[in-house]
Amino acid sequence: MSEDDYRQLQSALVIRPDMGDLIPGSGGLRKLRWRIPGRGKRGGVRVIYYWVMSREEIWMLLAYAKAKKEDLSPQQVKLLRRIVESWNNG
């Protein structure tokens, strides 16, 4: 993802921080499918982020190519949930 693509993603999330789907059992993590122009049908990325409503912040946790991986494993979701919990409590 280029810097310009990342800025476009950030701008979209500022406007609609709830645009990603909630990941069940994740404690509020969201998954967003983001298309990157010129890369074809499978050329986009999936972005995992957490929206901290009380602080009006969005924490970007993970981005990966759609062509490489469909969903996070339950273990990955659990680990990311623990990371967010530690940030919220720390």
Tell where the protein language model's regions lie, with residue ranges.
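N-terminal first-folded block
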Residues: M1-K31
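Short, charged/polar surface micro-motifs in flexible loops or helix N-caps
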Residues: I15-M19, L29, P37-R39, M53-I58, ...
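Short capping/connector residues at structural and topological boundaries
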Residues: P24-G28, P37, Y50, V77
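Short glycine-centered, acidic/aromatic-flanked micro-motifs in structured strand/loop junctions
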Residues: W34
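Short, surface-exposed coil-to-beta transition loops
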Residues: R42-V47
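Enriched for short, Lys/Arg-rich terminal
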Residues: W51-G90
